[in-house]
Curated annotation (Swiss-Prot):
Region entry Disordered, spans: 231-265
Signal in keyword set: no
GO cellular component terms attached to this protein's record: cytosolic small ribosomal subunit
Family membership: Belongs to the universal ribosomal protein uS2 family.
Protein name, as recorded: Small ribosomal subunit protein uS2
Source organism phylogeny: Bacteria, Bacillati, Cyanobacteriota, Cyanophyceae, Nostocales
Amino acid sequence: MPVVSLAQMMESGVHFGHQTRRWNPKMSPYIYTSRNGVHIIDLVQTAHLMDEAYNYMRSQAEQGKKFLFVGTKRQAAGIIAQEAARCGSHYINQRWLGGMLTNWATIKTRVDRLKDLERREESGALDLLPKKEASMLRRELAKLQKYLGGIKTMRKVPDVVVIVDQRREYNAVQECQKLSIPIVSMLDTNCDPDVVDIPIPANDDAIRSIKLIVGKLADAIYEGRHGQLDVEEEYEDYEGSEEDYDYDETEYADSVIPEDGEEAE
């Protein structure tokens, strides 16, 4: 029995790609047809590759491997955080900071700073400081929690990275390639399947599509670690349109690592 059925994918809009003029020709093997100027993804291939991805991630989880979920677009952010937490994995859902993996030693110092500030806040130590200093440290804490909260317990670079929107998260892809970290990625019709290890052709703009695919990948990790899936639980509803969003790619260029008291651009 397939991990995800054609009916489930159809209902979630997994088959809708981008406009034909925005396609990447390398995705042609995964495209079934076009309709009204929009490419339609071949869901038979998606189902097959989902089985491959599920089995791979379950196997890796059984071996104790660590996973990082990456998805910073607004449709994916809430899903990424919830599903990563559900299966005991790490996540980045706000902004990919340059060197997040390739310069992990430096990023780790910021993570340590985050944990130190959290301890001081919980113990009440910040309340003993002058108001101005305490306010500055709390702003720093909020910023670090926003960007690094999802990797707070990550001790080393991950063994496998799961990506939503490979084109948008290309900085993450490049760092994974440099470190030979396997990538499992949702690929819309404007993406490049050659730069990931296990491609999953799917609509990466619709909330229901992202929720279905990412949820199944989280299931694989959970099953690998616990031997069976937990009882089906209610998921949060993620607000937002399921339309095809356009975005300014220059906004998501390499980001500098935030320093103390400095807001990332």
